[in-house]
C-alpha cells in the first residue's frame, strides 16, 4: 500500500513538471528532478487549468526519470506488466498427450504373464493381473494405485512392453451388499473374493473403471505420474463361461455378461476414445462354450473392438482360429479382427502323451497356421500353465519364430502346410512342414531355420519340410 501511494505522488510530480516545461515557465533548475516538486511562476496557468483542456503531449526529452525508481508499464486494465508475466508463467500448461511408441507392440507374439524376454516388441497379458476392482478400491471411494498397479505399469514401461489388461469387476464390499447370500465361487483368483456376480452398485463400478482407464490413457489429464506411453487394450473379464466345480471366473449367464460388456465398453471409451476393448476370452470352440457366447455375440454389435479366443491343449491345428473366424462371421462380425490370448500346445484329451520334441513341432505349425487363419496376436501360455506347459523346446520354438517373423506385415496360406509371411524389410519368410517344398519362383540360396533354432544356408530347390522350418528369402529380417 505504501509503495502504491508513493507511485501516485511521483506520477503527480512528474505531471506538474511536464506542464511547466511545456508552458516555457522557468524553474529553479534547468531540468526537473523526479524527486523535486516544481514551483509555479506568477501569471502562468496552473496544472488544474491545463487539465480542463485537451490532453497535453509531453515530449520524451522533457522529463528525466530516475531509472532506479521507474515502475513497470501497466496495460489498459491497470495490471502491472511484471505481474502479468508472472501470471502467465503460472498458468497450467496444456496437457501433454503421450504417443504410442513405434517399437511397443510391434510383434505379433505375446506371452501370458507379467514379463517377457527373448524378443522385442512383444505383448504381455498378466493373468490374473492387478486390475481387480476390490484391489484398487479396497473401500468404497478409496483408491490405492501405487502398490497395486502403478508399480507394475512402471516396470512394464521400463521394459517397453505392450500390455493387454484384464478387467475384473469384483469388490468384496460391493458383492456383500447384494450377493452375500448367493453360492460362493470355487477356485477364484486371490484378491477377488468368493462372490463373482454382476456388480451390485453399477455406478460405483463405472466410476472405478473410468478412473482406471483415465489414469493410464496418456492424455495428460489425471494420468499416473511418470507414465511413458498409454495403456490402450482392455479385456472385459476372462472366460466368463467357466463356471465349473474346479474353476470359476463369473457366476452369471450370457445376458448378464452382455450387460457387463456394454457397461464396461461405454466406460472405457468415455475415458479414452482411442482404447481397444476385447471381449472376455472365449475358452474354446467346444459346444458348451459356443452356447454361452452365441447370445452374447448376437447382442454385442458395437460393444467390442477385437474378438478373443483361447486354445488349451486342443487337437485343433490352428488354435481354433479358423472356427472362431467363422463364428464371428456368422454372427455379424465379419470385419472384426481377433486375438488368441491363450495358446497352450499340449497333448489333446484322450490322446497318447506327446514328447517335448513333438510339442515343439506342433508349436511351429500351430502358430503359423493360426496367423494364416486370421489371428493377429497370439499369447503363449507356456510355463504359466499349472501343468508346467509343453516344455523348454516349445518355448524355444516360440522365441525363434518371434525373432524371425514376429513383425510380419502380411500372411498368406499357399497350401495346408506352406505359409508365406511378408516382412517389412522386403524379405519373405516361408513356414513349411510335412514335406512341403518352396514355390517354383524361389531360387538361389536361402536361410533355413528349423523348429529348434538350428540355422544353415541351402539351395532353394533342395529345401523341403521334412520337419517344421522357416525359410528366409532375401535379407534376414
Regions found by a protein language model. Name each.
Residues 103-108, 122-132, 162-167, 232-236, ...:
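Structural recognition of the beta-strand scaffold that forms the well-ordered cores
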Residues 83-231, 235, 241, 245-247:
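N-terminal substrate-binding region of glycoside hydrolase catalytic domains
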Residues 179-304, 311-327, 331, 348-365, ...:
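Active-site cleft segment of glycoside hydrolase catalytic domains centered on the general acid/base Glu
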Residues 9-19:
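Bacterial N-terminal signal peptides
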Residues 1-9:
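Bacterial N-terminal signal peptides that target proteins for export
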Amino acid at each position: 500500500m505504501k509503495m502504491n501511494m508513493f507511485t501516485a505522488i511521483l506520477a503527480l510530480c512528474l505531471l506538474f513538471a511536464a506542464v511547466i516545461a511545456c508552458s516555457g515557465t522557468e524553474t529553479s533548475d534547468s531540468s526537473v528532478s523526479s524527486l523535486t516538486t516544481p514551483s509555479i511562476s506568477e501569471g502562468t496557468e496552473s496544472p488544474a487549468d491545463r487539465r480542463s483542456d485537451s490532453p497535453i503531449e509531453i515530449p520524451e526529452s522533457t522529463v528525466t526519470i530516475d531509472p532506479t525508481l521507474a515502475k513497470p508499464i501497466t496495460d489498459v486494465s491497470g495490471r502491472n506488466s511484471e505481474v502479468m508475466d508472472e501470471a502467465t508463467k503460472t498458468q497450467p500448461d496444456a496437457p501433454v498427450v503421450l504417443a504410442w511408441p513405434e517399437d511397443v507392440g510391434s510383434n505379433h507374439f505375446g506371452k501370458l504373464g507379467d514379463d517377457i524376454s527373448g524378443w522385442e516388441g512383444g505383448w504381455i497379458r498378466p493373468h490374473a493381473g492387478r486390475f481387480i476392482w476390490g484391489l484398487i478400491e479396497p473401500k468404497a471411494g478409496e483408491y490405492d494405485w501405487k502398490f497395486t498397479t502403478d508399480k507394475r505399469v512402471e516396470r512394464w514401461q521400463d521394459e517397453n512392453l505392450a500390455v493387454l489388461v484384464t478387467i475384473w469387476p469384483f469388490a468384496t464390499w460391493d458383492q456383500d451388499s447384494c450377493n452375500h447370500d448367493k453360492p460362493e465361487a470355487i477356485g477364484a483368483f486371490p484378491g477377488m473374493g468368493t462372490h463373482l456376480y454382476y456388480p451390485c452398485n453399477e455406478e460405483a463400478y463405472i466410476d472405478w473403471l473410468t478412473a482406471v482407464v483415465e489414469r493410464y490413457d496418456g492424455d495428460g489429464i489425471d494420468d499416473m505420474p511418470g507414465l511413458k506411453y498409454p495403456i490402450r487394450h482392455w479385456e472385459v473379464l476372462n472366460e466368463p463361461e467357466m463356471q465349473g466345480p474346479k474353476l470359476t471366473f463369473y457366476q452369471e449367464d450370457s445376458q448378464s455378461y452382455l450387460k457387463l460388456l456394454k457397461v464396461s465398453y461405454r466406460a472405457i471409451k468415455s475415458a479414452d476414445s482411442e482404447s481397444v476393448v476385447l471381449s472376455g476370452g472365449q475358452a474354446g470352440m467346444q459346444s458348451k462354450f459356443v452356447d454361452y457366447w452365441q447370445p452374447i455375440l448376437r447382442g454385442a454389435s458395437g460393444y467390442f473392438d477385437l474378438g478373443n479366443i483361447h486354445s488349451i491343449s486342443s487337437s485343433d491345428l490352428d488354435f481354433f482360429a479358423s472356427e472362431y473366424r467363422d463364428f464371428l462371421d456368422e454372427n455379424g462380425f465379419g470385419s472384426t479382427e481377433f486375438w488368441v490370448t491363450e495358446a497352450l500346445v499340449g497333448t489333446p484329451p484322450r490322446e497318447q502323451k506327446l514328447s517335448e520334441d513333438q510339442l515343439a513341432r506342433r508349436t511351429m505349425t500351430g502358430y503359423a497356421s493360426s496367423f494364416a487363419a486370421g489371428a493377429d496376436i497370439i499369447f503363449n501360455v507356456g510355463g504359466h500353465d499349472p501343468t508346467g506347459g509343453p516344455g523348454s523346446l516349445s518355448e524355444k520354438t516360440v522365441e525363434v519364430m518371434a525373432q524371425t517373423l514376429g513383425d510380419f506385415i502380411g500372411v498368406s496360406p499357399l497350401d495346408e502346410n506352406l505359409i508365406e509371411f511378408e516382412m517389412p524389410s522386403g524379405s519373405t519368410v516361408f513356414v513349411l512342414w510335412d514335406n512341403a517344398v518352396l514355390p517354383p519362383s524361389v531360387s538361389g540360396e536361402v536361410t533355413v531355420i528349423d523348429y529348434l533354432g538350428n540355422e544353415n544356408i541351402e539351395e532353394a530347390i533342395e529345401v523341403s519340410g521334412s520337419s517344421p522350418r522357416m525359410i528366409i528369402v532375401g535379407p534376414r529380417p
